[in-house]
Amino acid sequence: MLEDKEILTMYHFEGKEDYAFNLIMRKYSDRLYRHIIKMVQNHDDADDILQNTFIKVWRYLPDFREDSKLFTWLYRIATNETLTFLKKESVKRFFMLSSAKITSTHQAYSDPFFNGDQIQFKLQKAIKRLPPKQRAVFNLKYFEDLKYEEIAEILGGTVGSLKASYHHAYTKIEQFLKEND
C-alpha cells in the first residue's frame, strides 16, 4: 500500500482524484469502521456513518493542506460524524435500541451455552454508558492506542483536557465494573 504522501500527491498533482480516493478508502475503511462501531455498537448505523464520513472526505479532500496527518484528519471526520449521529438520535430511539441490545445480550449471557467473555461484555456495557465525547476519547486511547497529541488532532481540545476526559472515563468504567461484579 502506498504511503499517504504518495496518495495525496496523486490526488492533488497528478489528476488521479478517483484512484487516490479509492486508495484512501481501501486503506482506512476497516480502521475507521472499527472506530465507529465501538462508539455506536450497531452495524447498520456504523455503515451509514462510515459512508457519510467518506462523502465528507470526498467533498473536503481538495482543501486538505496536510497540516495534520491524513489518518488523524480522517478520524476527526469519522468521530465528528459519529458524535453528530449520537446527538441526533432521539432519546426514545436510543433507549429502545439500548434496551433491546442489553436484553438480547443479557439473554445470551445468562444462557449456559453462551461462551462470550464476561469481562468484555461488562466493559462494552460500561463504555456504552459514557457520554459520547468521553467514549470517543476512551476508544481512541484504549483500543486504538493513539497518543494524546493524535487524539487532540482528531477531536480538538488540549492534551490536558483529553487526559482528564480519559481519566474520568476510566474511573467511571472502573466504578461500573466494581458495582456490577
Protein language model features and the residues they cover:
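Internal acidic/polar
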Residues: 2-5, 92-117
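C-terminal edge and immediately downstream basic/flexible tail or linker adjoining helix-turn-helix-like DNA-binding
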Residues: 11, 93-96, 100-101, 122-125, ...
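A short pre-motif secondary-structure segment
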Residues: 137-141
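Structural recognition of an alpha-helix C-terminal capping motif at a helix-to-coil junction
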Residues: 34, 48-55, 68-80
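N-terminal module of bacterial RNA polymerase sigma factors
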Residues: 1-31, 38, 128, 179
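Arg/Lys-rich amphipathic alpha helix in sigma70-family domain 2
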Residues: 63-65, 76-96, 168
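Sigma70-family region 2
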Residues: 13, 41, 54-69, 89
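Short, Lys/Arg-enriched C-terminal cap helix and immediately downstream tail that follows
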Residues: 36, 87, 130, 135, ...
